C-alpha cells in the first residue's frame, strides 16, 4: 500500500470515528433531526472505510 493510499484509509477511518462522536453529542443535546443526518453520515463513512479497506487492502 502506498503512502497516499494509507493516508486515504486513515482519513476515512478518522471521519468514521469523528462522525460517531458527533452523533453521540447530538443525541445528548436531543437534536433528533441533526442526529438522524449524522447517523446517515456515519453509516456512509463506515461503508466508505470498508470499501477502501477491501480495495486497497
Residue ranges of each PLM-predicted region?
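Short, charge-rich amphipathic interface segments used for partner binding and complex assembly
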Residues: 3, 11-57
Amino acid at each position: 500500500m502506498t503512502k497516499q493510499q494509507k493516508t486515504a484509509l486513515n482519513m476515512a477511518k478518522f471521519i468514521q470515528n469523528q462522525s460517531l462522536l458527533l452523533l453521540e453529542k447530538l443525541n445528548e443535546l436531543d437534536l433528533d433531526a441533526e442526529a438522524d443526518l449524522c447517523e446517515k453520515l456515519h453509516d456512509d463513512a463506515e461503508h466508505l472505510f470498508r470499501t477502501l479497506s477491501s480495495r486497497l487492502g
